[in-house]
Amino acid sequence: MSAVINKEALLAKIEEALRRGKPRRFRQSVELILVLREVDLSKPENRINLLVELPHPPKPNKVAAFAHGAFEVQAKNAGVDAVISRDQVEGLSGNKRAIRKLAKQYDFFIAPPDLMPLLGRVVGPIFGPRGKMPEVAPPNVDVKSLVERLRRSVRVKLRNEPVIKVRIGAEGQKPEEVLENALAVLEDVNRKFSLRQYLKDVYIKKTMGPPVKAKALEVLAR
């Protein structure tokens, strides 16, 4: 990634964003916003939905498991924050309010393949647009490793607009840690869209803070 991004320039923008804005009564997140150009999002192949593991997550994500049988035992042993049974899923059918509440409660969900058709019918219409559909856990997967990875990950999406917004840190973290998180996101995006070709602008901002803007040429290595 160092061959593509000017780390010193991006770090300076992160430091500026962390300095700016009034103190708040809560710990603000630090957001990375990428504006792309010349990306035809009418083509499905140009849309992205990635999970990026951050080297320095600002806090562990909450992970819930839709599970039954042996997978339920594995999920509990992996330390998930909640286990939702097949019966509970069926009980959610038609209860949009409860499904929306569940989607807000947890950052990520996991499920075995055999539960996915039921989940698609019951929670899919609400979970899908929110990017909350469960990660499928294949039969031989190390469930504990999967849960640990999800606790450290962020979802990077590009769908209807050529803009990517993702949390890369929080107040109280070292700027260098936020930088390494940003580089992890940029590296994965660069695999799909060459940043040298498609990146237009970069913004760094705290939740309630003013955005710090950088043109692509300012943060791309020369």
From Swiss-Prot:
Part of the 50S ribosomal subunit. Keywords: Repressor, Ribonucleoprotein, Ribosomal protein, RNA-binding, rRNA-binding, Translation regulation, tRNA-binding. GO terms for molecular function: rRNA binding; structural constituent of ribosome; tRNA binding. Binds directly to 23S rRNA. Probably involved in E site tRNA release. Protein L1 is also a translational repressor protein, it controls the translation of its operon by binding to its mRNA. This is Large ribosomal subunit protein uL1. The keyword tRNA-binding applies. PANTHER family: 54S RIBOSOMAL PROTEIN L1, MITOCHONDRIAL, LARGE RIBOSOMAL SUBUNIT PROTEIN UL1M. Belongs to the universal ribosomal protein uL1 family. It comes from the Archaea. GO terms for biological process: regulation of translation; translation. SUPFAM superfamilies: Ribosomal protein L1. GO terms for cellular component: large ribosomal subunit.
